[in-house]
Amino acid sequence: MRRAVARRCALESRTTMLQYTDYNISTLRPYINWLYFYFAWGLSGKPQEAKDRMRAEAEQMLDSFETRYQTHAAVGLFEANSDGDDILIGDVRLPMLRQQHPTREGEPNLSLADFIRPQASGVTDRIGVFATTVDLALEHDFLTDDYQRMLAQTLADRLAEATAEVLHMEVRRSLWGYAPDENLSVAELLREDFQGIRPAVGYPSMPDTSVNFIIDRLINLKQIGIRLTESGAMKPHASVSGLMFAHPKAHYFELGRIGEDQLRDYAHRRGLPVELIRRFLK
């Protein structure tokens, strides 16, 4: 796998690794999930001929990207434990939310904190914190033509996700190394047939975009060209951030509706006004 550069940084006491990596587009192309690309263009369920035409145009644009752009990734591996619904990373407390909807008998209401060993166990666990993005120029070089702009943006989104896919693979197999013997095809990777998850900020299990401010504190998003808006949204738009869990039973889930009681408790744990948290969760 060809990478332009990987930079390691000086570590805090609770950080086991912090790395910034630039990826070539050619490295990422096999890991693009075209199903989501077709969905973005409203082609899900459409005839294959329409998808093939769209794919051909996209591949042509990707050819032009290869000599002009790169993507960028940051990943930190940290010692961690859970404390109730909070994840403790050194002196950083990362509050999580928990499902509140009724479940079948014997099934728990889940929180991402459940996938980290509790502090009371006396055993230190680990967690990954990551972000990926594209060159800012990629989002600015296609503004004069609406169709080209939309095509470039949807490809940029896919490339940011493909970067996260490749980064997660490297974390599992070597950087963290909890699955050193993993040997999956690209199709199996895209089906997520591996141990561990990487829930992203703004998605169903971690919908609060302001979590990005905590992620920024941990891995310094500016190092890969990401800046945050007042709500924690990322610029460039084609950026992904989140957490990596290695627990063998970790899986994705949707939080669903959050009650007013938990909203207030979560705001208290975040140290932020309830109405501000309510806005972040919209």
Where are these regions (language model features)?
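C-terminal accessory domains/tails appended to large, multi-domain proteins
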Residues: 107-282
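Active-site loops and adjacent core secondary-structure elements that bind or stabilize anionic groups
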Residues: 1-154
